[in-house]
Amino acid sequence: RLWKDTVNFYARGYVSNTLPSFYMRHYHSNHYYWDNENMDKEFRTRVEGELNISRWKTNLRAGVENIKNYTYFNQNAMPAQESGNIQVLSATLKQDFRLGILHLDNEVTWQKSSNETVLPLPQLSLYHNLYLLAKIAKKVLTVQLGADVRYFTKYNAPAYTPAIQQFHLQAADDQVEIGGYPIVNVYANLHLERTRKFCREDH
């Protein structure tokens, strides 16, 4: 307990040692063809801790993962493996606030890959949702009006190849960073018994 509030702490961990999927090992089509019989098993270990304070609407989670023989699609949209170890550190804070019918939900994630060339990640991701939530018309109609915003720092996001329907590393001669700008949505949500109407404008 913390100042008479209940505090929950959780610790988790897992270990996995599995072959890459059949799709990563075998694929035949007109434009792409591969048979990777000698792929090694992908070995993953992860430990994380989580702190939750319900009354404060606070949740904090942090962890570290080690990946050996990470399997991915390379710059040529072909399956590949990184024989070394890759570490990924991450921490996420969720904090919600409420004042009457006014709500503000927040989520902040920090993450770091030890090999940005093979496993690029945005270092910081933010999500905020500000809205009014109330019941009207004799409390049978629930109305939610609000706006949310998403943001992540610039990074070399994966490219996409429709022929194999997969994301892969960007080509070396055509590197483009995305991110570094907010994505804002304004929305309205109405709920009356079994009827729900939702509209949203994206930017």
Regions found by a protein language model. Give the residues of each.
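Exposed, low-structure sequence patches enriched in small/polar residues
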Residues: 1-203
